[in-house]
C-alpha cells in the first residue's frame, strides 16, 4: 500500500461533483418540507468551491446528498460520473472513503490521543500497522502538529483541533474534502490559519474542497467558485470574481455588503451629489485594481477632472475587486469620454448565472 500523502487516483471527470435538477423533500407531521428545489450545479475537479447561504438555505442537505447520507427526491447527484443514489451499500463504502469531512464542532474523540484520532479511519480501513504509522506521521507534519501527537483534544486550541480534524479527514487519501461550517467556531485569526491550510490541501494534494458556510469573508478568502443558496434555490453561481463583481441576486448583494461597501443608495447618492453639485457621479465596479488605475490614468488625458468620493477594494481568489463612485467634472465632451472609459471597466467581467427565486412555501433545512 502506497503511503504518499496525495489522494488516491480516481476517474478524471472534469466535473467532480454534479447536481442535475436535484429536489429534496422531507415529510414532517406538518407536511412536506422542500429543502432543495431543482438545484443544478457542477463542481470542478481540483477546485475550491464555496456554497454560501443563511440558516435554512439547504446547505446541510446539499452536503448529505454528496456523501450519500440522503438521496434526492428528484434529480441526480453524480460523483466522478456515478449516480450516488444508485449505489448499493457495498459500493457506497469506497465512495465515502473517497470523501473526507470536517465539521464546526471538530467531532474528536476526547479520550484518545491526537495520534489515535488520526489513526481511527485507517483502522476502520484495515491499514497495515507500518503503513498506518507512516501515514499518521506524514499527516501530523502536514498540519503542523507533530509535537502534539500524544496530547489529548482538551489540551489543544480550537484551531489545533480543527487541524486534527483535517488530518483525520485526509487519512484515507480522499479526493474530495467537505468543510461544513468548519471555521464558524473560530476567531478571525484562527479562521485565517485554517483557511490557509485548506488552500494547501487543495494546491499541494489536488483535493477538491467544498466549503459550506454562511460567512462571506470565508468565501472571499478561499473560494475559486461560488454558489449561493436561498430557501433551497440556487440563486447564483459562477467564479468568485464574477459573483463578487456582478452579484445578480438580492441574497448575494446582502452577503457582499458585509465585506465590501456597495454603491451608494438613493439617500447617499443625493448627499454625494449635493457635495459635488457640478460633477457627474459614476458608479464603477472593477475586478482588478490596476484596471481601475489605468482607467483613471486615461481619464487624466481627456481634460476631465475626477475624484473618488465613495468606495473601497478587497482581495478575492484571483485578483482584487473594487466598488467606487467617481465624481467627474470639466467640459461636457471630456466628461462623456471619461464616462465611457469607466463603463469599459465595469463591463470587463462576465455576468454570473442567476435565477429568479420563487417565494418558498416551506422553510428549507
Curated annotation (Swiss-Prot):
Coiled-coil intervals, chain numbering: none
Catalyzed reaction equations: L-methionine(out) + ATP + H2O = L-methionine(in) + ADP + phosphate + H(+); D-methionine(out) + ATP + H2O = D-methionine(in) + ADP + phosphate + H(+)
SUPFAM superfamilies attached to this UniProt entry: P-loop containing nucleoside triphosphate hydrolases
Enzyme class: translocase
EC number: 7.4.2.11
The keyword Acetylation belongs to this UniProt entry's keyword annotation: no
Protein name per the record: Methionine import ATP-binding protein MetN
Lineage start: Bacteria, Bacillati, Actinomycetota, Actinomycetes, Propionibacteriales
Amino acid at each position: 500500500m502506497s503511503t504518499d500523502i496525495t489522494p488516491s487516483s480516481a476517474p478524471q471527470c472534469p466535473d467532480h461533483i454534479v447536481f442535475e435538477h436535484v429536489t429534496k423533500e422531507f415529510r414532517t407531521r406538518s407536511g412536506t418540507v422542500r429543502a432543495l428545489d431543482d438545484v443544478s450545479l457542477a463542481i470542478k475537479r481540483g477546485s475550491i468551491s464555496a456554497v454560501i447561504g443563511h440558516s435554512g438555505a439547504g446547505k446541510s442537505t446539499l452536503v448529505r446528498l454528496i456523501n450519500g447520507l440522503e438521496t434526492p427526491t428528484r434529480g441526480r447527484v453524480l460523483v466522478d460520473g456515478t449516480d450516488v443514489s444508485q449505489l448499493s451499500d457495498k459500493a457506497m463504502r469506497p465512495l465515502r472513503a473517497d470523501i473526507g469531512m470536517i465539521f464546526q464542532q471538530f467531532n474528536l474523540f476526547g479520550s484518545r490521543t491526537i495520534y489515535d484520532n488520526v489513526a481511527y479511519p485507517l483502522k476502520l480501513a484495515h491499514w497495515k500497522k507500518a503503513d498506518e504509522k507512516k501515514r499518521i506521521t506524514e499527516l501530523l507534519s502536514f498540519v503542523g502538529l507533530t509535537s502534539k501527537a500524544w496530547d489529548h483534544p482538551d489540551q489543544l486550541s480550537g484551531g489545533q483541533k480543527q487541524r486534527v480534524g483535517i488530518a483525520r479527514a485526509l487519512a484515507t487519501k480522499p479526493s474530495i474534502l467537505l468543510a461544513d461550517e468548519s471555521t464558524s467556531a473560530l476567531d478571525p485569526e484562527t479562521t485565517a490559519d485554517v483557511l490557509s491550510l485548506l488552500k494547501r490541501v487543495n494546491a499541494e494534494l489536488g483535493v477538491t474542497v467544498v466549503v459550506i458556510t454562511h460567512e462571506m469573508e470565508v468565501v472571499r478568502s478561499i473560494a475559486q467558485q461560488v454558489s449561493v443558496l436561498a430557501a433551497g434555490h440556487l440563486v447564483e453561481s459562477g467564479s468568485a470574481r464574477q459573483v463578487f463583481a456582478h452579484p445578480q441576486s438580492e441574497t448575494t448583494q446582502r452577503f457582499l455588503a458585509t465585506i465590501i461597501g456597495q454603491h451608494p443608495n438613493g439617500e447617499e447618492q443625493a448627499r454625494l451629489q449635493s457635495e459635488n453639485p457640478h460633477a457627474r457621479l459614476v458608479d464603477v465596479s472593477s475586478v482588478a485594481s490596476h484596471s481601475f488605475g489605468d482607467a483613471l490614468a486615461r481619464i487624466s488625458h481627456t481634460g476631465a477632472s475626477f475624484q473618488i468620493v465613495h468606495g473601497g477594494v478587497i482581495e478575492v481568489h484571483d485578483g482584487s475587486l473594487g466598488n467606487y463612485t467617481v465624481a467627474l467634472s470639466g467640459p461636457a465632451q471630456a466628461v462623456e469620454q471619461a464616462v465611457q472609459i469607466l463603463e469599459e471597466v465595469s463591463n470587463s467581467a462576465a455576468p454570473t448565472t442567476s435565477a429568479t427565486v420563487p417565494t418558498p412555501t416551506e422553510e428549507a433545512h
